[in-house]
Amino acid sequence: MATKFPSFNQGLAQDPTTRRIWYGIATAHDFESHDGMTEEKLYQKLFSTHFGHLAIIALWVAGNLFHIAWQGNFEQFVLDPTHVRPIAHAIWDPHFGSGITEAMTQAGASGPVNIAYSGLYHWWYTIGMRTNEQLFQASIFMSILACWTLFAGWLHLQPKFRPSLAWFKNAESRLNHHLAVLFGFSSIAWTGHLVHVAIPESRGQHVGWDNWLTVLPHPAGLAPFFTLNWGAYAQNPDSLDQVFGTAEGAGTAIFTFLGGLHPQSEALWLTDIAHHHIAIGTVFVIAGHMYRNTFGIGHSLKEITEAHNTRHPNDPHKGSFGINHDGIYETVNNSLHFQLGLALASLGVATSLVAQHMGALPSYAFIARDYTTQSALYSHHQYIAMFLMVGAFAHGAIFFVRDYDPELNKDNVLARVLGTKEALISHLSWVTMLLGFHTLGIYVHNDVVVAFGNPEKQILIEPVFAQFVQAAQGKMMYGFNALLSDPTSSASLAANSLPGNHYWMDLINRQDALSAFLPIGPADFLVHHAIALGLHTTALILIKGALDARGTKLIPDKKDLGYAFPCDGPGRGGTCDSSSWDAMYLAMFWALNLLAWVTFYWHWKHLAIWQGNVAQFNESGTYLMGWFRDYLWLNSAQLINGYNPFGVNSLSPWAWMFLFGHLVWATGFMFLISWRGYWQELIETLVWAHQRTPIANLVGWRDKPVALSIVQARLVGLAHFTIGNILTFGAFVIASTSGKFG
């Protein structure tokens, strides 16, 4: 007899109802809950999945390279990167009529194509790629890499090649390896590519497999390196008149500290980027030699954490903070969920910073003038950062349920955080209410006075503290004369004493959207506080969910119920929204709400600057109807007209996605609001009708159909809500921006 799904849980496989399928999918990746799972097997399985993950990434990159080389216009883009619209891939669709075929035949293509808003063309151009042949070669390499990593994943599951549990628990060696080899060496290797390939190409000199061993990346070769005359590598940088990709105005420097942007490509200087990578690679290689290796050389993490205490005789606190980090080393090293939570939080912060800096400090040549790509990449990275951050708190909560040992952590910082959770949660609650009432109150007040014809009665607050911070970095327009905006300050004198030319002040004081600090006023002040409200509310729900994971006054035995337990009904005073899973589920809605405010703000402010109409954001951004009318409605107009009775245009696929996204989003409410009993009755009715209908009654079920549990329905509803949100906003951002700028 064939084994029924899920094979990893034979108890669940015997379930005669459709619950079997749902619970099987839900626990497929929860290796801890699988039959016959040991701690060693768990680590080995997870280790192998990392190789699978790498294979998927390599395959995705290979697919992009292959389709752009095959169906794109990369070589035409290289000749004129500011005017040629990059093609992602061709479209073959049996639903296309002549109108849409004509509308989608664009960017010099002979048939219907999609325009690329991923920034891949700019990335590949910046790193020195110039021909379709190079893209094909890279695609083949990435495909081979995908096969190799898949093989590595399979190999490490074979008995002879399975690492032992002790190998996985050797935190210091793993840290050394990740710091020195993965981060350090890869950063230095990337410097090598930039210096040997990308920088020469940016100066009109091709370096390929045929000549890379004979072309010196710097006229002096390695002599300055060995004679410690490293400054030689910074001399003779590219001039301000350099034409990117040609020898005109090119210098010979490879590691510089120029600051600001290349005037023509409007991206960071490639020589600055190379300097950054060699510096960070060196730091990481040094860091990768700090922790205790198998020869007993280096620091012990356990000793470091346990030395972080207030028990030292000279410490003024004299142990008043408990025993600090005692027990933390074992707690982290023995909990995969703790480690994953830390990794997700770190990556989440980094991804959000990437979103900001791709706009404020663009590193790819000419990408700053591709407004649609910039808008899409900002939204994309902020959305990903949000998912990663919510995941960090989710696994933090699972840690408290599954892995936390109260005895091991007695009176240390973890225990202290749990012990003071009421204070933490109530303070966060107070902050969210303060932000919410005041921000909404000012928006609503402004709305009313504008509606009644008295816009001069709006409450408009200048963000003076933020303006001061900008001035301290060198923004002159506010007249603060602080630090770098004061030519006579110690900061300015120190900056001016650096040898050579530096351009960060030019970048900060630019008059366009590429200024590192855009001018800010009352509209920014209000939306900043709205975003702060979203951040604090999301954090409140997530932190409360994690800190209450083990127990509350209402449910002191919560840790015994697991991470996601169903509603108990009114028996214990009502426990419907009390599992940690429910907190993460509720936080997702606030996180998506917050993302809307963050991305709306960035997008509208930039649209206004790009269109030369800064006053639109500054004047309409101070009241709610301004946001609804002059941002959402005004920018949806072209989108809603993507197709109409008179024909279609190239925005019509985005218009359709906008409509479809709303449908998916609204479908979510069907699962989020309905009661479980209604679904069970509906299913029973449908099954009854099915069984009594000719032809339809030939199809039967092996499993008895049962309604989704409350937790399952919430998940399905949230999935629809989230995907609908992404489809709707993605289509809106791309269509509203490309409709204006191409």
From Swiss-Prot:
Binding residue positions for [4Fe-4S] cluster: C567, C576
Any one GO molecular function term: magnesium ion binding
Gene3D superfamilies: Photosystem I PsaA/PsaB (1.20.1130.10)
Catalytic activity: reduced [plastocyanin] + hnu + oxidized [2Fe-2S]-[ferredoxin] = oxidized [plastocyanin] + reduced [2Fe-2S]-[ferredoxin]
Keyword Transmembrane included in the entry's annotation: yes
Binding-site residues, phylloquinone: W679
Listed GO biological process terms: photosynthesis
Record-linked NCBIfam families: psaB
EC nos: 1.97.1.12
HAMAP family given in the database record: PSI_PsaB
PROSITE patterns in UniProt: PHOTOSYSTEM_I_PSAAB
Cellular localization per UniProt: Cellular thylakoid membrane
Family statement drawn from the similarity comment of this UniProt entry: Belongs to the PsaA/PsaB family.
TM ranges: 46-69, 135-158, 175-199, 273-291, 336-359, 375-401, 423-445, 525-543, 583-604, 651-673, 715-735
Protein name: Photosystem I P700 chlorophyll a apoprotein A2
Subunit architecture: The PsaA/B heterodimer binds the P700 divinyl chlorophyll special pair and subsequent electron acceptors. PSI consists of a core antenna complex that captures photons, and an electron transfer chain that converts photonic excitation into a charge separation. The cyanobacterial PSI reaction center is composed of one copy each of PsaA,B,C,D,E,F,I,J,K,L,M and X, and forms trimeric complexes.
Keyword Iron (UniProt): yes
Lineage summary: Bacteria, Bacillati, Cyanobacteriota, Cyanophyceae, Synechococcales
GO CC field: photosystem I; plasma membrane-derived thylakoid membrane
Organism: Prochlorococcus marinus (strain MIT 9301)
Keywords, in A-Z order: 4Fe-4S, Chlorophyll, Chromophore, Electron transport, Iron, Iron-sulfur, Magnesium, Membrane, Metal-binding, Oxidoreductase, Photosynthesis, Photosystem I, Thylakoid, Transmembrane, Transmembrane helix, Transport
Underlying gene: psaB
Residues reported to bind divinyl chlorophyll a B1: H662
